[in-house]
From Swiss-Prot:
This is Phospholipase B. GO terms for cellular component: extracellular region. Keywords: Cytolysis, Glycoprotein, Hemolysis, Hydrolase, Lipid degradation, Lipid metabolism, Secreted, Signal, Toxin. GO terms for molecular function: phospholipase activity; toxin activity. Expressed by the venom gland. Disulfide bonds: none annotated. PANTHER family: PHOSPHOLIPASE B-LIKE 1, PHOSPHOLIPASE B-RELATED. It is an enzyme of class 3 (hydrolase). One of its GO terms (biological process) is phospholipid catabolic process.
C-alpha cells in the first residue's frame, strides 16, 4: 500500500506537478504469478477508496486490461495490447488514461529499463549536457502542466491533459513493478527522456555550446560529437495504376541500440466530443507513448507516416524554448483530435517546440475510393522547423502513382530555412530533394511495386555493391547498413520495415520486421562485432521474418 503523502525524493517533483490531478490517491495491489512470455494484467479504479488495484489476470470488466507478449528474442518484436474505458463502471477520461499508462508501465517496465540503458550513453555525452537537458525537460514539463491547469475548457489542452495523465500512470506502473521485483525503477527524468528521444535529436544540438557558436553546421560536426546522426528513415505511399490498391510503408534508420521494439495496439474509450479517436496501432518502443518511427494506423481512418529532416541552419535551433510542447506530445494530441489531414496539421502546429523537425504524411483512407478516385485531401504533407509549420494537400502528386519520403524537405520554404540550399552548394546534389540517391531509386523502382511482396522488397532494398545510384555506399539506398561501411562501420542504419495496405488498415493490421536488411546476400547483423555498444536485452543477431501485427482483444 503506497500513499502519495510519503514520496521518495526522486518522486517529489512529479507528485507536486500532478497534485492538481491525483492528490490523495491510494494504490492497492493484488499480485499474482507472472507467466514467462505473455503477461496479462487488469487495472481497477476503486471509486469509494479513490484507489487503483491491479491483478495479473485478463478481466474485460476492469477499467484497463491487456497483455504484453515478449517475443523479442524469437521474432524481434514484443506486442502490447491495452483496452481502457470498456469496463462495467463509468470513469473520467483522466482516470482512464492514468490506468492505461499505469498498465503499460507495469507490463513493460523491464524493457523500459533496458531501452534507457542502451540509449542514454549514446545520446548524453557529458554531465554538462545532461544537466542542461534535465533543466529543459523539467521547465517544459512544469509549463505544460500549468497550461493544462489554466485551460481546462480548451479542447486542445484538455486532450494534452489526457496525455500527461497517461504519462503519470506510466511512471507509477514502472515504480510498482520495480518494488515487486526489488529493482530500481526508472526516474521521472528517465521516463521523460525516453518519450523525448526524437525531440532530443534537435534539443541536444540546440543546447550544445560548441554547436551554438556558429549559424551553420554540417553533418560531420554532429557525428564528431555524437555517435548518431540526425535519425533518418524511408517511407513510401504507392498507388496502383488503376487505383486497385494503395500500399504504405516505413523503414526506420537510427542506432541499432534502439532495436528493442514493441508493436502497440491501444484502444481507449475516451468520452470527449473533441477527441475523434482513442484507438491506434503503431510500431514503438518500451516506455514511449509515440511511435517515433513514425508508423500509425488510427481509429479516425488516418494513416500517419514520418521521416526526419535535418536542420543545418543553427540560428533556427537557437529559437527552441521550454515554453512549448514537444513533438511527441503534439503528435499524440493531433492523433486523438483530428479526423482529416488538414485538422491534424492545424492541431499539430500549435505550441511548436521546434524539436524533432520532420515531414509528416497523413493519408486519409475515408477519401480513397478504390478503382474510382482519390478525393482532394487524401494526402496532406506537414513539415516543421522552429517557429514554423507548413502543410499542404498533395493528393495531386499521389494520383500520379506514389509519394516518397527520404529525409529532405519537400516544402521550398522549409527546405531553404533549414539550410539545405547552402548544404547542397557545399556537399553536392545528392543532398537535394530531386537528386538524392533515394529519390532516384524510388523514382526508378516504385513502378515495380504491384503487390505486398514487392512493396516489402522495395522497403528492404539495399544493393549498394551493384546499384549505380548507391555508388558503393551502403547508406545511399532505401534501407541503410552503416555497419557495412568499410571506412567507419558503426552499428546504425535501417533496422525495421512496416508495410500495409488499405484493407489491412481497416483491420488495424500490418506486417513488421525488426533488424537490418539481409537481402541481396548481405550478412546478418550480429553484436559480436560491436560489443562496445551497449545492447542490453537485445537479440545477439537479427535474421527475423515479417510478423503479422493484429489486435486480438
Amino acid at each position: 500500500m503506497i500513499r502519495f503523502g510519503n514520496p521518495s525524493s526522486s518522486d517529489k517533483r512529479r507528485q507536486r506537478c500532478r497534485s492538481w490531478y491525483w492528490g490523495g490517491l491510494l494504490l492497492l495491489w493484488a499480485v499474482a504469478e507472472t507467466r514467462a512470455d505473455i503477461h496479462y494484467a487488469t487495472v481497477y479504479w476503486l471509486e469509494a477508496e479513490k484507489s487503483f488495484q491491479i491483478k495479473d489476470v485478463l478481466d474485460k470488466n476492469g477499467d484497463a486490461y491487456g497483455y504484453y507478449n515478449d517475443a523479442i528474442q524469437s521474432t524481434g518484436w514484443g506486442i502490447l495490447e491495452i483496452k481502457a474505458g470498456y469496463g462495467n463502471q463509468p470513469i473520467s477520461n483522466e482516470i482512464l488514461m492514468y490506468a492505461a499508462g499505469f498498465l503499460e508501465g507495469y507490463l513493460t517496465a523491464s524493457h523500459m529499463s533496458d531501452h534507457f540503458a542502451n540509449l542514454f550513453p549514446l545520446m548524453i555525452k557529458n554531465v554538462i549536457i545532461e544537466q542542461k537537458v534535465k533543466d529543459f525537460i523539467q521547465k517544459q514539463d512544469e509549463w505544460t502542466r500549468q497550461q493544462i491547469k489554466n485551460n481546462k475548457d480548451d479542447p486542445f489542452w484538455r486532450n494534452a491533459g489526457y496525455v500527461i495523465a497517461q504519462l503519470d500512470g506510466l511512471y507509477m506502473g514502472n515504480v510498482e513493478w520495480a518494488k515487486r521485483q526489488k529493482r530500481t525503477p526508472l526516474t521521472d527524468f528517465e521516463i521523460s527522456f525516453l518519450n523525448a528521444i526524437g525531440d532530443l535529436l534537435d534539443l541536444i544540438p540546440a543546447l550544445h555550446s560548441e554547436l551554438r557558436k556558429s549559424d551553420f553546421r554540417s553533418m560531420p560536426d554532429v557525428s564528431r560529437i555524437y555517435q548518431w546522426d540526425m535519425g533518418h528513415c524511408s517511407a513510401l505511399i504507392k498507388v496502383l495504376p488503376g487505383y486497385e490498391n494503395i500500399y504504405f510503408a516505413h523503414s526506420s534508420w537510427f542506432t541499432y541500440a534502439a532495436t528493442l521494439r514493441i508493436y502497440k495496439h491501444l484502444d481507449f474509450r475516451i468520452t470527449d466530443p473533441q477527441t475523434k479517436t482513442g484507438r491506434a496501432s503503431f510500431s514503438s518502443y518500451p516506455g514511449l507513448f509515440g511511435s517515433l518511427d513514425d508508423f500509425y494506423i488510427l481509429g479516425s481512418g488516418l494513416i500517419m507516416l514520418q521521416t526526419t529532416n535535418s536542420v543545418f541552419n543553427l540560428s533556427l535551433l537557437k529559437k527552441v524554448v521550454p515554453e512549448s510542447l514537444f513533438a511527441w506530445e503534439r503528435v499524440r494530441i493531433a492523433n486523438m483530435m483530428a479526423d482529416s489531414g488538414k485538422t491534424w496539421a492545424e492541431t499539430f502546429e500549435k505550441q511548436n517546440s521546434g524539436t524533432y523537425n520532420n515531414q509528416y504524411m497523413i493519408l486519409d483512407t475515408k477519401k480513397i475510393k478504390l478503382q474510382r478516385s482519390l478525393e482532394d485531401g487524401t494526402l496532406y504533407i506537414i513539415e516543421q522547423v522552429p517557429k514554423l509549420v507548413k502543410y499542404s494537400d498533395q493528393t495531386k502528386v499521389l494520383r500520379n502513382g506514389y509519394w516518397p519520403s527520404y529525409n529532405i524537405p519537400f516544402d521550398k520554404e522549409i527546405y531553404n530555412m533549414s539550410g539545405y540550399g547552402e548544404y547542397v552548394q557545399r556537399h553536392g546534389l545528392e543532398f537535394s530533394y530531386e537528386m538524392a540517391p533515394r529519390a532516384k531509386i524510388f523514382r526508378r523502382d516504385q513502378g515495380k511495386v504491384t503487390d505486398m511482396e514487392s512493396m516489402k522488397f522495395i522497403m528492404r532494398y539495399n544493393n549498394y555493391k551493384e546499384d549505380p545510384y548507391a555508388k558503393h555506399n551502403p547508406c545511399n539506398t532505401i534501407c541503410c547498413r552503416q555497419d557495412l561501411d568499410r571506412r567507419t562501420p558503426v552499428p546504425a542504419g535501417c533496422y525495421d520495415s512496416k508495410v500495409a495496405d488499405i484493407s489491412m488498415a481497416a483491420k488495424f493490421t500490418a506486417y513488421a520486421i525488426n533488424g537490418p536488411p539481409v537481402e541481396k546476400g548481405l550478412p546478418v547483423f550480429s553484436w559480436v562485432h560491436f560489443n562496445k555498444t551497449k545492447h542490453q536485452g537485445l537479440p545477439e543477431s537479427y535474421n527475423f521474418d515479417f510478423v503479422t501485427m493484429k489486435p486480438v482483444l
